[in-house]
Amino acid sequence: MQKNEIKQSDMKPLIIDSSWTERFLPDPPREKDNRPPFRRDRGRILHSAAFRCLQAKTQIHAIGENDFYRTRLTHSLEVAQIGSSLVAQLKFLETFESLSQTLNIDKNELQKQLKPLLPSNDLIESLCFAHDIGHPPFGHGGETALNYMMAEQGGFEGNAQTFRILTKLEPYTENAGMNLTRRTLLGVVKYPALLGVASPQYAELNFSRNIDPRFVRIHDWIPGKGIFRDDLKMFNWLLENLSENDRTLFCQFKKVRENPAESLHTRFKSLDCSIMELADDIAYGVHDLEDAIVTGVVNPHQWQAAHVALKQIPSAWLHENIDSISQRLFSDKHFERKQAIGALVNFFITNVRWKLTANFDEPLLRYNAELPPEVIAALGVFKKFVWDYVIRNVDTQRIEYKGQRMLTEMFQIFESDPERLLPRNTENRWRNAPKEGKKRIICDYIAGMSDAHALRVYQQL
């Protein structure tokens, strides 16, 4: 028996602790408001300014300005639909087969004990709606530019900013952001570690810093993944109901850093987060490919290498269907392409299954959703194709480079005369912040802009 396996006699009765529906601030429902806690969370996210801003943030810049392309808002809606479908699929008996073999426990018993762990539609949609709200304008270029400017103050990263918006910045409360339930916040945290620890150790690397943003070697400043130290208080509150063993295990990295340029990644995430992340990966790999095909960013010739790679994966479904799907993806008939996209999404969703992560005390950490190795390999082919031919597309890179320059210059300008140039609310926050926290206020302001708003402000300056 492997180290992390659990005997049937060790299976604890399923109990979801009531603390997972607690909020940082007392927040009783309003009169006659009978909504469950996660439905209230969903409403707060949907009605937030940060969520609305996603409609003006482009998912893939090279695809251009037309009525078809996806924004981060439409992407988030599609992730929510896929996430809900994954939750529905995980209720079926066959999704427990692999876990049943791992634990040597009858799959019917597992289904009975674990189904109540699954997030409600309100909860999974909340996570999917929220997952991108911390991403700054101009994609990875904008993210890396802000990390460059914040390197000595804890760095910047989109997932960390999402947690910060939910727990501090969104003005639903004065100082606790949207004041969401603990379980919703747990589901948003993909990387439960401090960003400054997970990121490359810039102080040791002595990378060149150039005051002219045109000449910054931006790839030296790609951030790691984690939580800002500024938000440690809320992160500690989030995990305070876990046992000491669970907290330590949950925040472990996959490996020990071997050199200061290396980014570290955490090993674990919650069940809810694993479902949301799968939904995001499927939407990225399949729907972003659809955008690129429709708008002519990629062509059948470029697809051939991916087609060959997919045929080599040991999957009966792929062997039987990939020729037809590849043909229909690039068909002149729109309905054929939509059928191919639908078949691919269905393939990924219907292969989801339960897995054991480690011997956590908390069941929401002990189990995750996963795809079998051959299906992960297939999804990896799609994601790599999008990365190689869409994200790395020269038009995308030029737009991100332009955005990186704009954000870096704006940061420098605001930092030079914040009391004159920042909006009043932001200026008040800047003035009230301690000296070591003032740059974070400027960073929050720039990160919250849409692509178009950032361009307008830059032109004003």
UniProtKB/Swiss-Prot annotation:
Presence of keyword Hydrolase: yes
Start and end residues of each HD domain: 72-285
GO molecular function annotation: dGTPase activity
InterPro entries listed in its UniProt record: dGTPase, dGTPase-like, dNTPase_2, HD/PDEase_dom, HD_domain, PHydrolase_assoc_dom
SUPFAM superfamilies in the cross-refs: HD-domain/PDEase-like
Signal peptide region: none
Origin superkingdom: Bacteria
Family as reported in the entry's similarity comment: Belongs to the dGTPase family. Type 2 subfamily.
Name this protein carries in UniProt: Deoxyguanosinetriphosphate triphosphohydrolase-like protein
Natural source organism: Haemophilus influenzae (strain 86-028NP)
